């Protein structure tokens, strides 16, 4: 019998050049995948890089990578260091630099003034278009259309006039008094009347309560209770909003709601409840004005959802920026004891220690307490809330510092850099409030609240809150510096401390 070859042996002896059916299928699938990736993903990106390389702004100073890719700026934004990123570029390359394709930063004070004030360029759609709960219904902060913005601002402006803001002073003071009670409690529990207090938490809690009572008609009692779900949810939303300005694809993440369900329910219930009370009672707060102006009829420009969105912006942007300004002011004072003593002397002049029950009153002392205002101004010069400036957009081809800027380019008027230039300030990096008492101080480059038509509508509200808070705290308590803390800042919509807490020694005066 002749032995038959084993099927395995026979298979092994097949010519190596003869591909199997499986390998042909694998080869075809690989080619299809490579072709797909090349056409859909790689080729468009290569085209974009080539386009960026030949863009007019590629001639502007800055790293080559910034001109070709948005990733350096994106990474800085994710880390919260975009203001440091811009500063380092200006230090190396000069007053105009490329941040990313289609985005430049300008630190020249004459050009900053032209952009935000003289010519009043429109806000950048590339940035503020991603800062909206509803893309079709922006808030006052996120409008880029000038006519629509002007209409909304006219509607809201009466709420932020000095007269109406003064009428809210008594309810604002109830929140400040709660903070005083809390500090007294800490001092009672401290060693020999001295307590180490997380003043970052206390000041932010106070600012939230003040905005809460003026915007929602009732304090959120964060100072008394230590926390509240709404501020923590809004702070998380603020982080996402900061990222979405430069990373807009975040909003397309599956199952990510356009509104936080808790915030949406909370604000809707507040607004609906106030609407039902309109005929029976009146309130002296911002919510009253917002609800009175709203109308849910078809075609309305200001519906209940708009009231919700505007109130959320007021609560987040208003509390965050004001609290940070107050905290940074106290920090500057603690690191400059002579300035602190001079300010406390001014406080005692206007509110003598022999009259401890005298109520802090903006109408009485705000205009006269010039050194307090100088300390606040000097703090906001060095640490402005809008660290890189409010981004604007060229509506037509323009020339900035000799460089052509194509229409549609986002331009960051870097106000923080403009605030610290040797040409305008003696020892610009030093905290010297006295510089604001000089006659020429009114003509210096200074834009902590922006300028032009987009100047912050809440400016007077913020100053009143800062005055009430700082004067009351300095009347009642002595603050001392605690060494060894992280004082670096991050920028997420507003400039703030990187650390989650900042401690100070507190005792009664």
From Swiss-Prot:
The chain crosses the membrane at residues 30-50. Disruption phenotype: Abolishes the production of lucilactaene and NG-391, and leads to the accumulation of prelucilactaene A, prelucilactaene B, and two isomeric mixtures of prelucilactaene E, and prelucilactaene F. Keywords: Heme, Iron, Membrane, Metal-binding, Monooxygenase, Oxidoreductase, Transmembrane, Transmembrane helix. Its cofactor is heme. Pathway: Mycotoxin biosynthesis. It is an enzyme of class 1 (oxidoreductase). Heme binds at residue 456. Pfam families: p450. It is found in: Membrane. The keyword Membrane applies. It is a single-pass membrane protein. Its EC number is 1.-.-.-. Its main location: membrane. SUPFAM superfamilies: Cytochrome P450 (SSF48264). Gene3D superfamilies: Cytochrome P450 (1.10.630.10). One of its GO terms (cellular component) is membrane. One of its GO terms (molecular function) is monooxygenase activity. PANTHER family: CYTOCHROME P450, CYTOCHROME P450 12A4, MITOCHONDRIAL-RELATED. Belongs to the cytochrome P450 family. Cytochrome P450 monooxygenase; part of the gene cluster that mediates the biosynthesis of the mycotoxin lucilactaene and the lucilactaene-related compound NG-391 that act as cell cycle inhibitors with potent growth inhibitory activity against malarial parasites, moderate growth inhibitory activity against cancer cells, and no activity against bacteria and fungi. This is Cytochrome P450 monooxygenase LUC2. It comes from Fusarium sp.
């Amino acid at each position: 019998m002749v032995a038959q070859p084993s099927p395995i042996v026979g298979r092994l002896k097949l010519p190596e050049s003869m591909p199997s059916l499986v390998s042909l299928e694998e080869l075809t699938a690989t080619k299809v995948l490579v072709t797909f990736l090349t056409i859909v993903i790689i080729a468009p990106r290569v085209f974009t890089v080539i386009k960026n390389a030949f863009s007019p702004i590629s001639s502007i100073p800055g790293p080559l990578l910034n001109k070709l890719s948005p990733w350096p700026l994106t990474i800085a934004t994710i880390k919260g260091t975009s203001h440091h990123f811009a500063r380092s570029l200006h230090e190396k390359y000069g007053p105009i630099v490329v941040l990313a394709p289609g985005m430049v930063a300008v630190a020249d004070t004459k050009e900053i003034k032209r952009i935000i004030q003289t010519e009043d360029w429109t806000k950048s759609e590339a940035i503020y278009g991603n800062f909206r709960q509803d893309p079709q219904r922006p808030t006052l902060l996120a409008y880029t259309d000038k006519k629509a913005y002007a209409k909304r601002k006219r509607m809201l402006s009466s709420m932020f006039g000095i007269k109406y803001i003064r009428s809210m002073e008594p309810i604002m003071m109830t929140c400040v008094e709660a903070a005083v009670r809390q500090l007294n409690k800490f001092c009672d529990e401290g060693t020999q009347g001295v307590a180490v207090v997380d003043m970052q938490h206390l000041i932010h809690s106070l600012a939230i309560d003040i905005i809460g009572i003026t915007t929602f008609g009732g304090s959120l009692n964060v100072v008394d209770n230590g926390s509240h779900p709404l501020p923590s949810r809004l702070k998380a939303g603020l982080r996402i909003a900061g990222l979405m300005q430069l990373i807009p694809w975040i909003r397309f993440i599956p199952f990510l709601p356009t509104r936080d369900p808790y915030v949406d329910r909370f604000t809707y219930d507040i607004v609906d409840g106030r609407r039902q009370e309109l005929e029976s009672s009146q309130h002296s707060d911002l919510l009253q004005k917002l609800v009175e102006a709203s109308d849910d009829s078809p075609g309305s420009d200001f519906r209940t959802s708009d009231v919700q969105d505007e109130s959320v912006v007021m609560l987040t942007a208003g509390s965050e920026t004001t609290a940070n300004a107050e905290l940074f002011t106290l920090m500057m004072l603690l690191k400059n004891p002579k300035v602190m003593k001079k300010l406390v002397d001014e406080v005692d002049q206007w509110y003598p220690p022999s009259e401890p029950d005298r109520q802090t009153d903006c109408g009485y002392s705000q205009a006269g307490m010039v050194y307090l205002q100088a300390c606040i101004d000097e703090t906001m010069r060095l640490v402005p809330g809008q660290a890189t400036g409010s981004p604007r957009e060229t509506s037509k081809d323009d020339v900035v510092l000799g460089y052509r800027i194509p229409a549609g380019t986002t331009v960051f008027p870097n106000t923080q850099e403009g605030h610290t230039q040797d040409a305008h300030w003696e020892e610009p990096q030093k905290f010297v409030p006295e510089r604001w008492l000089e006659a020429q101080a009114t003509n210096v480059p200074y834009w902590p609240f922006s300028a032009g038509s987009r100047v912050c509508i809440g400016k007077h509200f913020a100053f009143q809150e800062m005055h009430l808070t700082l004067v009351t705290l300095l009347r009642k308590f002595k603050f001392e510096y605690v060494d060894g803390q992280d004082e670096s800042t991050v920028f997420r919509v507003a400039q703030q401390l990187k650390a989650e807490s900042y401690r100070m020694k507190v005792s009664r005066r």
